[in-house]
């Protein structure tokens, strides 16, 4: 959404906390992460445990009468709305606009006559039907729907899995931008009508064509102060997650064409390179954060927990400039870390990179089976960590293939250590292969011989981060101090 000279964006965050990241840009190219609209996910107790692939689906970001609005669908609970006068927050608690199973991908529209509407899709896994779009009238304050709505588009015959609709009014037409065909191999469809409830005409306005940008999937249309039109959308890049693309929009005869029509078939293809948007000026390069020196009183905005966090999991000591993770017990009957809530993770920032961290491990003297270290997490995972055992401290490397199905870890390396301070490293290649290594002095690193092919998460890419877990119950915990978390690319 654009407000004046400023652009704002949010995205699906599923089950992680904090959720609904808020990004700000001056030119649609350089984006700064400025906060999150959802510090905790509701219902709180439900999301105190990892709910992979659930939670926040396909939000819409809007600005209306001096306030910012975010609408999102939770497929298990319904359609929620949050609002704020400042996009940095504070944001209101999520308000349930419509309760129901399988209600997803909402997008509001405030019309010129003061009436309001909401378009949404359905998740077949909960609703028992998909590939349809519904428009309902909404109270102008955005808090609830005034009717059950009407099906305005049926994609079953030619546009299966149409979803992620975004609602606009432009030059007398109601437009719904919506991808169809699925995340991996879909295309962008646009619907238009002079009447909010239809009938709607439709046209395919962008597809993969001869490019290597598969999808292209959900996104939003925005204009610049200079009158240009652009479309931001995501591409499913497997283990690297859903990466963002920017494409030009050109209008002809009341229809948008997104990207460039290279073969004159009337359908745009995503651009790999293009001039930047003309926003009336130039702006400095800005990128979302990744490295963290832990020299602030708060975690960097790039970090997210696997579930709603407890305030006893982490402490940043600005005097010592380190992050302390206290161990917390593994969930009952956990066969691996897939359902562990207290994993501190962040997205992959590039196709190839190296992460370094320095850790001092101080486990409890009660021999609780504590383990702390570095992890790459997805539907499978690999970790390099220090672990306390009955006969001392060990450096261990473990992999859980098919962790999502309960597969136990396999130990590929274990070495007894004479020190509790260790430098841990992982490097990711362009092909998505991770190698782990360690050092006791920060200069000479020993590589773990077993490489790990990175596996994506549930509708997200793989993540990298830190953890501290224990096997047993006690009245206190040990801890691990991390001096930094540094990326090099």
Indicate where each model-derived feature is located:
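Carbohydrate-active catalytic/glycan-binding domains of CAZyme proteins
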Residues: 1-489
């Amino acid at each position: 959404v654009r407000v004046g000279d400023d652009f704002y964006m949010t995205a699906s965050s599923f089950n992680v906390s904090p959720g609904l990241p808020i990004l700000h840009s001056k030119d649609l190219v350089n984006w700064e992460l400025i906060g999150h609209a959802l510090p905790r996910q509701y219902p709180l107790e439900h999301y105190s445990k990892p709910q992979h692939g659930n939670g926040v689906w396909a939000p819409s970001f809007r600005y209306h009468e001096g306030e910012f609005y975010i609408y999102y669908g939770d497929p298990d609970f319904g359609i929620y709305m949050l609002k704020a006068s400042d996009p940095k927050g504070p944001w209101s608690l999520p308000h349930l606009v419509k309760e129901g199973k399988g209600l997803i991908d909402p997008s509001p529209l405030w019309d010129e006559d003061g009436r309001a509407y909401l378009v949404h899709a359905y998740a077949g896994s909960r609703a028992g039907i998909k590939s349809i779009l519904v428009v309902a009238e909404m109270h102008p304050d955005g808090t609830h729907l005034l009717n059950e709505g009407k099906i305005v588009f049926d994609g079953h015959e030619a546009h299966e899995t149409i979803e992620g609709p975004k609602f606009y009014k432009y030059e007398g037409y109601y437009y719904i931008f919506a991808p169809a065909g699925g995340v991996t191999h879909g295309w962008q469809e646009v619907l238009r009508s002079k009447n909010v409830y239809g009938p709607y005409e439709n046209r395919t306005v962008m597809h993969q064509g001869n490019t290597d940008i598969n999808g292209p999937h959900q996104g939003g249309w925005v204009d610049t102060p200079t009158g240009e039109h652009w479309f931001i959308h995501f591409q499913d890049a497997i283990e690297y997650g859903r990466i963002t693309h920017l494409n030009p929009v050109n209008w002809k005869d009341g229809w948008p064409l997104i990207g460039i029509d290279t073969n004159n078939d009337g359908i745009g293809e995503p651009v790999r390179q293009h001039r930047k948007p003309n926003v009336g000026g130039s702006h400095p390069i800005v990128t979302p954060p990744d490295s963290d020196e832990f020299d602030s009183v708060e975690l960097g905005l790039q970090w997210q927990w696997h579930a709603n966090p407890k305030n006893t999991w982490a402490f940043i000591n600005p005097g010592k400039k380190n992050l302390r993770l206290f161990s917390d017990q593994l969930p009952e009957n956990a066969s691996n870390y897939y359902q562990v809530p207290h994993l501190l993770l962040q997205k992959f920032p590039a196709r190839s990179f190296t992460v370094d961290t320095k850790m001092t491990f101080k486990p409890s003297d009660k021999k609780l089976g504590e383990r702390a270290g570095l992890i790459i997490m997805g539907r499978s995972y690999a970790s390099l960590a220090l672990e306390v055992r009955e006969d001392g401290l060990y450096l261990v490397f473990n992999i859980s293939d098919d962790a999502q199905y309960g597969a136990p870890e396999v130990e590929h390396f274990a070495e007894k250590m004479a020190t509790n301070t260790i430098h841990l490293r992982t490097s990711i290649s362009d092909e998505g292969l991770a190698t782990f290594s360690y050092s006791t002095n920060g200069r000479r690193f020993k590589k773990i011989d077993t490489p790990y092919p990175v596996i994506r998460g549930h509708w997200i890419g793989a993540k990298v981060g830190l953890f501290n877990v224990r096997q047993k119950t006690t009245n206190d915990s040990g801890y691990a101090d991390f001096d930094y978390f540094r990326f090099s690319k």
